[in-house]
């Protein structure tokens, strides 16, 4: 089924990424610290992996079954525009410096597009930024001020996957907003767990990172502010240690 999908998983610090289905082909765009890392691994090369074919399908199965990812279809953006934005970023990126821990997929399909910062420039902020740039209105909110009775327009901003997942889950259950639909079960039907992956358990490092990212998201998912909005808290700590 053609469409644009946001994936979220919340094991440890979690992860968020985007995939596009177009003309029976799968395109996955996943950003993270997949290469060189700075102190405590909280910063590093910001690498965008662009996966297709068997790479993309295996990544789907890993996310669905190892990390219990959830999938949300976003109906108010086009496959063409979403692909154009991500592939423009990827095409303008640089080949990463290989590291011992770097995965094969990243060596083959990764490009450095910027500097990663857990609190400021991460998988969640990139996912939201690109989908917003592609034209979605799902992150636009408004409310009536109790003091002025005027309508206040706002934009939701997210730093951590758990906040994004919570927001998309609420949106998918809101019948007045038909532009977000959870499709996790249909993806599990289409992509069986042929490797018999077991769910990953959380690690201590992941819990520490989750706490840091949580603190950077300031007042919460509906505040309109995140570490990305206010510049992050680790911006000066990027110094490659490999």
Regions found by a protein language model. Give the residues of each.
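Solvent-exposed, polar/charged alpha-helical surfaces in well-ordered, non-transmembrane soluble domains
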Residues: 125-129
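Long, low-complexity, intrinsically disordered segments
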Residues: 229-242
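Non-catalytic ligand/cofactor/substrate-binding and regulatory segments of enzyme domains
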Residues: 1-121, 133, 149-220, 224, ...
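Active-site cores enriched in adjacent His and Asp/Glu residues with nearby glycine-rich loops
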Residues: 145
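Substrate-binding/catalytic groove segments of enzymes
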Residues: 132-142
């Amino acid at each position: 089924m053609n469409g644009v999908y946001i994936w979220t998983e919340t094991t440890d610090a979690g992860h968020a990424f985007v995939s596009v289905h177009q003309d029976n082909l799968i395109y996955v765009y996943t950003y993270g610290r997949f290469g060189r890392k700075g102190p405590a691994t909280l910063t590093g090369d910001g690498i965008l992996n662009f996966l297709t074919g068997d790479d993309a399908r295996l990544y789907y199965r890993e996310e669905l079954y190892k990390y219990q990812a959830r999938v949300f279809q976003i109906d108010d953006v086009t496959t063409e525009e979403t692909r154009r934005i991500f592939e423009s970023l990827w095409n303008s990126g640089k080949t990463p410096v290989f590291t011992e821990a770097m995965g094969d997929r990243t060596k083959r399909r990764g490009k450095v597009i910027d500097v990663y910062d857990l609190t400021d420039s991460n998988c969640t902020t990139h996912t939201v930024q690109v989908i917003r740039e592609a034209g979605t209105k799902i992150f636009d909110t408004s409310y009536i001020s109790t003091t002025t009775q005027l309508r206040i327009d706002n934009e939701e901003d997210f730093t951590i996957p758990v906040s994004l997942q919570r927001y998309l889950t609420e949106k998918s259950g809101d019948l007045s907003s038909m532009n977000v639909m959870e499709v996790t079960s249909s993806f599990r039907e289409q992509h069986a767990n042929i490797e018999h992956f077991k769910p990953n358990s959380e690690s201590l490092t992941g819990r520490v990172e989750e706490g840091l990212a949580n603190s950077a998201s300031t007042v919460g998912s509906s505040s309109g502010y995140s570490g990305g909005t206010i510049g992050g808290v680790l911006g000066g700590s990027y110094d490659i240690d490999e």
